[in-house]
Amino acid sequence: MIIYISGKVTGTTDYKERFAAVEKRLKVDGHRVINPIKVCRHIQPGSPWVTYMRTCIRALTRADAIYLMRGWRKSPGARLEQQIAVALDMVIMAQEKGD
């Protein structure tokens, strides 16, 4: 299964590590993973939020499922990605407290 990782980035400093840890765990479980941090690494730092989101949404549409990291509801981008995933009838996975 191809899984897109979704979570809070803006306003955090540890997002690269958090997304990398989730990516590693999902790959160990045998999944192909779309990590938006890697997908957006070509974007010039300081670019508008919408520039990142357009790239992320294109990547999301290539996935079969979305993995919602803890705290995703605090992120406007992650909430938008979740709404798109629901509209596209994707599998919705959510990080548990112990994950």
Task: Give names to the regions the model predicted.
Residues M1-D99:
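Conserved catalytic or regulatory cores that recognize and/or transform ribose-phosphate-containing ligands
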